[in-house]
Regions:
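Catalytic cores of nucleotide-enabled group-transfer and carboxylate-activating enzymes in metabolic
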Residues: 253, 257, 455-456, 477, ...
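Signal-transmission linkers at sensory-effector interfaces
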Residues: 308-336, 373-376, 411-461, 571, ...
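Heme-based O2/NO sensor domains and their adjacent alpha-helical segments
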Residues: 345-409, 497-502, 521-524
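Amphipathic alpha-helical "output/dimerization" segments
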Residues: 395-400, 414-424, 467-469, 546-570
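Primarily the dimerization/phosphotransfer
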Residues: 577-595
Length: 595
């Protein structure tokens, strides 16, 4: 609390029980949570320190290596702790008893803290696992399946999401009268390889099943690989449903039906609740459950029409005429629907847009003029894509309007035509957004490639810093600080020498590590938002890098390349110095023997 009183803004730290980067690229489960957290800290004028653990180069199988405020063999130290924050968001599972003990000790001391995901005692934001598993099982039952296998997470996570989803599966099997057989349960540890091995175990168990529910999408992906290898056709021989609805699930073959978790919303809610704690409001330990939604694709056995209905949110339509809806009623319904899909817009923004859209829609219907509605929709689509959200999320708002169109006093054909045109506008916005992303990706890849080439050939630190200063600024990264640890007594990370990589002329700062970020580098009067990535030197734990918490998808590769370049420069410097000393020794030897 003392830090908040010394500054204008509260500082929120974020830690996870595993790494954010899979070697150099983001892990898709944490990414939307982090984006939700960042959006909320911007909305509520809070400082942010994101702990982004890094994978070990060349070891894509090592995924439990988080950025953590304590130095351990299975984590990398970053300065995000009770000494420089006002509260922490901790994302479960923690994967280590020592990490659980650490955060529970903070709770016992009264430090503000909230969890995302189940597994620890304390205030928690969780997905409604029971609702999600139940919807998956009922959907498979509707397809005629009576024997449904289950790929669970980790046996060590029975107090967390693994246990909650497994218990929900068992309860659903009993309630729906499905085949009960312990051989139908296997553990996949929520990773692709584990899912593949779990499916092999299920196939070899001798138990009969025609469908599978996986506890997450990575396990489902591995299960699909094993089924393909065994010659099983999906969904004709075995139907499969995942959990999480990660972006890559939509491009699998066949596309994966999955339970969608509103991860962005969970991150956003975590900030809201943590700020309540920081300001002195006590929170009970009762978890806040966020609703899930089954996203229908091909892997469950649904045909094209059902998938299209789900994509366009057309499945639920009223069957009886009621009183004409008001703008307030439409706003409420649209807000609830869009909120489930949004990944970059806050609730109050969504409500404002929905109110404007509902008002414009009713105005266009009443005046027989489509322009007010079309203009408002185009404006909303532009603002949505500018915030980095998906234009497609407004399809669900159009579905709400369509479901209510038959209650309007005007001829029904008129609002229907208006909404058909709205679908076309959204489609055009999606196409434009996709093209923009393709262009941006090519431009960024070109700059990252050039930077990589320069770092690979750099033999001294001056070349490294010059290359980074030029290309990071061009890529829109305006904050990039390199901190190298220095020891004091028995503390190897007590001090840091911090260099501003984007502004190399700025003097190197010598600062207490646990007081990061240095106050003298926070002078613009606005909240800071920083992502901290560990740097591992040849001895491990050399330091960390701090970036703007904006381009998280780029930062892992940049940090890894910089770490490798600095190590290369160090080795070159040591080799050059060794050669110089050897030459001096040879000269002395020659002079000695020439006498």
């Amino acid at each position: 609390m003392a830090r908040f009183l010394r500054s204008h803004f509260p500082t929120i730290g974020v830690l996870a029980g595993w790494q954010y980067y899979w070697t150099a690229t983001p892990r898709s489960y944490l990414d939307p949570i982090f984006r939700g957290i960042r959006a909320a800290t911007q909305r509520f004028n809070s400082n942010l320190l994101l702990g982004c653990g890094m994978g070990t180069a060349g070891r894509s199988d090592v995924f439990v290596r988080p950025a953590w405020p304590a130095r351990t063999d299975n984590a990398d130290f970053v300065p995000i702790g009770p000494w420089n924050t006002d509260g922490l968001i901790v994302i479960n599972p923690l994967h280590a008893e020592s990490r659980s003990t650490y955060v529970q000790q903070l709770r016992a001391e009264g430090y503000p803290l909230i969890f995302v995901g189940s597994g620890e005692s304390g205030p928690t934001i969780v997905a409604d696992n029971e609702q999600g598993i139940d919807s998956a099982l009922r959907h498979l039952v509707d397809h005629g399946h009576r024997a449904v296998a289950f790929i669970a997470g980790s046996p060590e996570d029975m107090d967390g999401d693994t246990g909650a989803r497994l218990n929900a599966y068992r309860a659903g099997v009993a309630m729906l009268g499905l085949a009960e057989d312990e051989r139908l349960i296997a553990f996949g540890n929520h990773v692709v390889d584990g899912g593949r091995l779990a499916m092999q175990q299920l196939l070899e168990s001798g138990a009969s099943f025609s469908a599978v529910v996986a506890s997450n999408d990575e396990s489902a992906q591995g299960a699909i690989q094993a089924l393909h290898a065994a010659g099983r056709i999906i969904p004709e021989n075995v139907a499969i449903v995942g959990f999480d609805d990660r972006p890559e699930s939509a491009v699998l073959k066949p596309a994966l039906t999955s339970v969608q978790i509103p991860l962005f919303r969970m991150g956003y809610l975590a900030v809201e609740r943590l700020l309540q704690q920081i300001r002195g409001q006590a929170l009970d330990d009762q978890p806040i459950k966020v609703p899930t939604r089954l996203v229908v694709r091909e892997s469950c056995g649904c045909g094209h029409s059902a998938v299209l209905a789900d994509v366009l949110d057309l499945a639920a339509m009223p069957t009886e005429d009621t009183a004409p809806p008001s703008a307030a009623q439409l706003t409420q319904q649209m807000t609830q629907a869009v909120l489930v899909e949004a990944q970059g817009l806050a609730r109050d923004e969504i409500e404002f847009y929905c109110r404007s859209l509902a008002t414009a829609f009713l105005n266009s219907v009443q005046t027989h003029d489509p322009l007010p509605f079309q203009a408002e929709l185009e404006s909303i689509l532009g603002r949505t894509t500018a915030r980095g959200d998906d234009a497609h999320l407004w399809q669900v708002a159009i579905s709400v309007l369509r479901s209510q169109a038959r209650q309007l006093p005007a001829l029904r054909q008129e609002p229907e035509a208006l909404l058909d045109d709205a679908r076309v506008l959204i489609s055009a916005a999606m196409r434009q957004q996709h093209r923009r992303q393709v262009v941006d990706h090519r431009w960024t890849s070109n700059h990252v490639g050039r930077l990589t080439a320069l770092l690979l050939t750099a033999l001294d630190e001056a070349q490294i810093y010059e290359s980074l200063a030029h290309y990071l600024a061009e890529m829109g990264i305006h904050t990039a600080w390199l901190a190298l640890f220095e020891a004091e007594d028995d503390d190897p990370v007590a001090w840091s020498r911090i260099r501003d990589v984007v502004a190399p002329a700025r003097p190197v700062l010598h600062s207490r590590t646990r007081s990061f970020p240095p106050p003298e580098w926070q002078g613009d009067g606005r909240p800071f938002s920083l992502a901290l990535l560990p740097l591992s030197g040849q001895q491990g734990g050399a330091g960390f890098m701090a970036f703007d918490a904006i381009h998280l998808d780029l930062l892992g590769a940049i940090a890894q390349q910089m770490s490798a370049a600095l190590n290369t420069a160090k080795l070159y410097r040591e080799a050059t110095e060794g050669r110089r000393l050897a030459e001096e020794a040879n000269q002395l030897k020659s002079r000695f023997f020439s006498r």
